Amino acid sequence: MSLSTLKNRRERGFFDGQFLIAMPGMEDRNFARTVIYICAHSDAGAMGFVINRPQSLTFTDVLLHLDMIKQEEPIVLPQRARDFPIQTGGPVESGRGFVLHSDDYASDSSIPVSDDICLTATLDIVRAISKGAGPKRATMLLGYSSWGAGQLENEVANNGWLTCPANEELIFDRSLEDKYERALAGMGVTAAMLSAEAGHA
């Protein structure tokens, strides 16, 4: 599923607004120990963002890359912009930036993905954040994760993923190191418990 499909969707699918939490045995290195927020799911497939993989880039790096600021000029950003988190959202279009954010900011290009969360992938929101005028809660993700028709359903059926309702606090929490463990804890399990179960299956 692509971003254009997300824009044109007419109804929500079963996994919309869910977390996917990788099972401990996940062999795909792109997704091992990941927590993914599913933004769209339909018969055509699914799309979402990994929310616990840090990026080495800073928000200043992004602004320089987009020529919004110049290296030779003094760089003065609001505190919230200096600390703005950049994450790896997935292996598809990994050079493209997407901003998941609270619904207190909206532009013509913002796409609602839940009652409280929107997705914007244009320069307007980057400019707003750089000026301290962006949404109260947001994170930038480079790339996204995508599944074709029936692919995600098969992976879940084959015990590749756990699923649970998404938690907005966890989506925007900037502490990434133990987010996987906290997502599992929210379901009342640990990675060790799941590994032991798999070993006895």
Curated annotation (Swiss-Prot):
Origin superkingdom: Bacteria
A GO cellular-component term linked to this record: cytosol
SUPFAM superfamilies (UniProt xref): VC0467-like
Pfam families: DUF179 (PF02622)
InterPro entries linked to this entry: AlgH-like
Annotated HAMAP family: UPF0301
Family per record: Belongs to the UPF0301 (AlgH) family.
Record-given protein name: UPF0301 protein RHECIAT_CH0001061
Organism encoding this protein: Rhizobium etli (strain CIAT 652)
